[in-house]
């Protein structure tokens, strides 16, 4: 890690405070810079679905990465292993399956699907299709 655990915890608290101000209960961050800022994750894997997921009351964010990139998450982040969420390679390029199908499953399993979810709308590789999967699973959501 390039920064201390205390630095990462302080960053998380700042983000969570801003989430409260904006009424966001769950933040899905796809931008690699922001993932690094929040978790320390540092890998050349931006071209596949990945994100940091911040719950407004959580002690740590989640890091959502494909199986092949999980090693980088275990090495470069401060996160507990249970907060590194790994999706199987069979979600990649197997239409109609998509990694965000698994992400939505995780959100539902944690009973976060009814929360006010915020996403970064200007991140490379976060496509309109990715957003539609989140919206399909959350029919009451507004863009």
Residue ranges and their predicted role:
Residues 1-59, 108:
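Terminal domain-start leader segments
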Residues 27-30, 119, 137:
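General beta-strand structural signal in soluble alpha/beta enzymes
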Residues 32, 65-68, 119-124:
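Structural motif
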Residues 62-91:
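Compact, glycine/acidic-enriched structural inserts
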Residues 89-96, 141:
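A short acidic, often aromatic-flanked loop/helix-cap motif at beta-alpha or helix-coil junctions
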Residues 95-125:
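Hydrophobic alpha-helical hairpins/lids featuring a short glycine-rich hinge
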Residues 129-131:
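Rossmann-like NAD(P)H-binding beta-loop-alpha module
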Residues 134-143:
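Single conserved hydrophobic/aromatic residue that forms the stacking wall/gate
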């Amino acid at each position: 890690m390039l920064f201390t655990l205390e630095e990462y915890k302080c960053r998380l608290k700042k983000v969570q405070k801003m989430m409260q101000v904006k009424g966001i209960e769950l933040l899905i961050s796809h931008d690699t810079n922001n993932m690094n800022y929040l978790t320390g994750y540092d890998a050349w894997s931006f071209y596949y679905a990945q994100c940091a997921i911040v719950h407004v009351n959580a002690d740590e964010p989640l890091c959502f990465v494909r199986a092949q990139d999980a090693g980088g998450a275990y090495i470069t982040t401060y996160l507990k292993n249970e907060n590194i969420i790994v999706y199987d390679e069979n979600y990649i390029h197997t239409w109609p399956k998509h990694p965000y199908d698994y992400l939505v499953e995780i959100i539902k399993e944690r009973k976060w699907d009814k929360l006010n979810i915020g996403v970064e709308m200007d991140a490379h590789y976060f496509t309109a299709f990715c957003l539609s999967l989140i919206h399909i699973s959350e029919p009451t959501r507004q863009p």
